[in-house]
Amino acid sequence: MKVLFLIQGFSVAASRYRVLQYIPYLKSNGVDATVSLYPRTLKENIRFFSDLPKYDIVFLQRKRFNQPRLGLLRKRARRIIYDFDDAVMYRNSKSKDPISQSRRRRFAQMIQISDFVIAGNEFLKNEVLTFHPNVEVIPTSIDQNRYSLKDYNIKKKRVTIGWIGDHGSIHYLEKMRPIFERIGERYRYSELKIVCDIFFDCEKINVVKKLWKSEEEVADLQSFDIGVMPLVDDPWSWGKCGLKIIQYQGVGVPVICTPAGINRDLVEDGINGFWAMGSEEWEEKLSILIKDPTLREKMGMEGRRRVLEGYTVQACAPRLFSVLNKK
């Protein structure tokens, strides 16, 4: 079976976690896998479309083709699988109105020319079912061998509140700046660690600014004592697949999150982390975990157990292989 995987970039999170980490497993099971970036130039497009018949499957990760390339794609490709892990049919949380007819139209067109669709969560699956019956949920996952448990025996002088992500989502964290200021004032030994490519400052809490690097990602996560994932409860957020939480839990870090979308499934309030809505709840839950290292470890271990149940490459790779073999 020859499969062409189209991705947005080799360092893009969705490409790494929904395609690239599965390639070794697929190849070891007889899949002739080729990974390529989406064509951009005229020359790249000509080569891409001329080569399509060579492959049994073209696997598109997230990005949608527009007309007239969409029609040409359907004509040239033997079989199309579309994978996505964001609410691409809505505007993002920065917009006042999430509804976009043009986005929804492009999404529908992409779904309708596909033979099979892989959605990152149940909300996205239900969006697909409006246009196509052949859809399956495969969650975003991590490699349990790479994401090893943090060492809780290491004694630290500071309690680190951590967040990892990219510049497109840091605005959720930045809105919490007043909360972090008050936490820093109450707990002088607390700090905020941001692993990203852009940062912001706070006056009353020390901010550790760490540029994201793939080879240091797990170590950075293990340095967190509390992982946070604030969101806005809107359609864009409902489409998120909880990678931050899965990463935190994968190394045994307790989580505080906004109970929106998949966050409610990943975090059992009071078991492997806490839900928090307004400023008072965020301060309350942060305070509880800052003051109680035993609870942090207990919740962290529960979180890792949750991830190992179904959010690992080891659990999801066979499911992806099964989809590729569907006729």
Sequence positions of predicted segments:
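Conserved acidic donor-binding segment of nucleotide-sugar-dependent glycosyltransferases
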Residues: 269-280, 288-294
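Nucleotide-sugar-dependent
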Residues: 171, 215-220, 227-250, 256-265
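Carbohydrate-associated surface elements
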Residues: 123, 141
